[in-house]
Design a protein with these regions (language model features):
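Active-site rim/adjacent substrate-binding subdomains
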Residues: 1-147, 152-184
Length: 184
């Protein structure tokens, strides 16, 4: 496995629409290596999701996951943790009209975060890393991460989804001025 270079905001690959991966090619060693490298890169930079375009690969796939403190992956519906997943050619559909604003950051936009409105509950059709068709219902954090990473596949960055830029902030300022607001 290799740690890949992450494209930063301003690089054209982040604004391009990624190409679908033919299902017959998902198990190809090149795609499997890319998935492994995405996981390795995501962990190296302490991310919870990473899309192929973020590592200069214009393909419709991403990895995501959060490991529990005890090292075990948890159920996808848990609001604070999610298992490690690789999704290829995802199609996301909101399940309800409920939209919740939550804080997001991005490895391609280092040290900045903002409040982004997203559907709280979604349905996802995709292929897993073995090339099997899968359907997932996700809510809370997993739904937010899947929508964020799927946006990368369409050339959309998180601040494109922000209702306004009043909450766009550096991480240091977020910790200093915004974190206390979340806890009250």
């Amino acid at each position: 496995m290799a740690i890949l270079k992450v494209a930063r905001m301003g690089h054209p690959v982040l604004r391009a629409k990624a190409q679908p991966v033919p299902p017959s090619e998902i198990r190809h060693p090149r795609i499997q290596q890319l998935i492994d490298d995405l996981f390795e890169t995501m962990r190296e930079y302490s991310g919870i999701g990473l899309a192929a375009p973020q590592v200069h690969e214009g393909l419709r796939l991403f990895v995501a996951g959060v490991r529990a403190a005890d090292g075990n992956a948890i159920e996808l519906t848990d609001d604070t943790d999610m298992p490690f997943i690789a999704l290829v050619n995802p199609e996301v559909t909101p399940v309800s009209s409920e939209v919740i604003s939550g804080w997001e950051g991005c490895l391609s936009i280092p040290d900045i975060r903002g409040l982004v409105p997203r559907a709280d509950r979604i349905h996802v059709k995709a292929y897993d890393r073995q090339g099997r068709a899968v359907e997932i219902e996700a809510q809370g954090l997993p739904a937010r991460v899947i929508q964020h990473e799927t946006d990368h596949l369409d050339g959309v960055l998180f601040f494109d989804r922000m209702a306004n830029f009043e909450s766009l902030t550096f991480n240091d300022e977020y910790r200093r001025y915004w974190m206390d607001d979340e806890e009250t």
